[in-house]
Amino acid sequence: RIRKAMHGVPVETKLPDRAYRPEVSDRVYREMAWRADLILSEGGSVVADAVFDRPADHDRIEKAASDRGVTFAGFWLEADPLVLWQRVSERRGGPSDATVDILSRQLQRNATPPAWRKVDADRKLADIAAELASVSDAAAFAQRASLKTAS
């Protein structure tokens, strides 16, 4: 949604390829990290939903959390490539501009951030959400425990 806002269009509007050039993506991910830092500075929680397939991007979002002294829980959702291709090719409407060509390029990069938890996304949405919530709850508990120990 940040990219669409930067281009002044509604989220359902398909952007041209030039909107996905590396320098534009760099601005998008910097803005996302800046927003995350702002929210964390006010004591809020952040969910940053993006591809994060470039090391600079996932390093930047992790740094936003570490600079604020909060626990970071990064998740890398994976599914069988055939399932992903089917999902993308059947998608109609919505904010995503992804195509099967874009998906193919992303899969070739094989850019899983090393410290992020891999999550099998080839399951029911409820099962994925439950796994993410349990890990997030554990991270929040660890964060509270470390704050109590430090004080």
Predicted regions and their residues:
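Conserved substrate/cofactor phosphate-moiety recognition/catalytic segment
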Residues: 1-44
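Conserved nucleotide-binding/hydrolysis micro-motifs of P-loop NTPases
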Residues: 1-2, 52-53, 78-85, 123-125
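Short, hinge-like loop/turn segments at secondary-structure boundaries
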Residues: 10-15, 65, 91-95
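Helical mechanochemical/support elements of P-loop NTPase systems and associated helical scaffolds
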Residues: 21-29, 57, 84, 99-103, ...
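Loop/turn-to-beta-strand initiation segments
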Residues: 42-46, 71-73
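Conserved P-loop NTPase nucleotide-binding/switch module
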Residues: 52-53, 61-65
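Conserved phosphate-donor/acceptor-positioning beta-strand/loop module used by diverse small-molecule
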Residues: 68-88
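Small-molecule kinase domains that catalyze NTP-dependent phosphoryl transfer to phosphate-bearing small molecules
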Residues: 90-151
